[in-house]
Amino acid sequence: KKKAIWIHNDIQIKIKEEFKYRILHFFFKDKYDYFDTYCAVSQGALDSFKEINKNKNKDKCYLVIPNYIDTKEIADKLKEKSDIKVDKEKVNIVTVGRLCHQKGIDIMLDNIKQLSNVRKDFHLYIIGDGDEKEKLIEQMKRLDLEQYVTFLGNQKNPFKYLKEMDLFYLSSRYEGQGMVILEAKSVGLDVLIPKHLEKYCPPIKGVDDVLLYLKKYKKSNKTKKFDDLNDYNNNIRKELNNLFDASNDK
């Protein structure tokens, strides 16, 4: 039987930015030779992997198969009542993710500081925990953003908060696949990503100037419409079935 391996991140950037990952890759990189098919969760992750392995494994199969998103579970979690009160007169911005260097929350806070100089009708909610939490809270205080930013910590059900928001903002330095963007889209939120994240978050289009987008953004008065991502998930099922059928060929 043929063997497949999944690529879940931008390996090229992780090697560059994370010492521990650099060591792991050095010791385990030859293991890739034992696989017949390389599946990446986004084109960005695949391009990065192919660049790292450009001088070998040219006869192998390379595929992009994104992660499946369980929208039924999301729909169930949306039924839970939020335990925070947001100001509906303001633009409520949210982000969800680990508070680590990769996710670029420090970049987000710098942009929020600049935004606060030109408009006051917004609030940012940060959902997640991680090694950089205290550092980011200190940055928030140093930038005098306490009235504009709330850290909600790690939440088992972030969707009960997402349904109260207007705009989801992802500021990662790099991704594997920006699943959280599609999850936010399924809830009915507008989504914002910088241009360099497009290759990790199809079909979402990124913007060249994030700050300009935030300055001009106007919240919609339309009722949020839930998207079950049916076409997206069906395409993944087809790709997986094709992969499994091919893997069972002798």
Question: Model-flagged regions — what are they?
Answer:
Residues 137-153:
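Nucleotide-activated donor-binding/catalytic signature segment of Leloir-type glycosyltransferases, i.e.
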Residues 35-61:
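A short, active-site helix/loop in glycosyltransferases that binds the activated sugar's phosphate group
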Residues 219-250:
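A charged, aromatic-enriched C-terminal amphipathic alpha-helix characteristic of glycosyltransferases
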Residues 181, 190-194:
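Short hydrophobic beta-strand element within catalytic cores of glycosyltransferases
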Residues 20-39:
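Membrane-proximal helix-turn-helix segments that form the acceptor-binding/catalytic region
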Residues 15-16, 50, 63-89:
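Acidic anion/phosphate-binding donor-loop and adjacent secondary structure
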Residues 91-114, 131-137, 179:
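A conserved mid-protein helix/loop that constitutes part of the nucleotide-sugar donor-binding site
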Residues 154, 173:
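Aromatic "clamp/platform" in nucleotide-sugar-dependent glycosyltransferases that forms part
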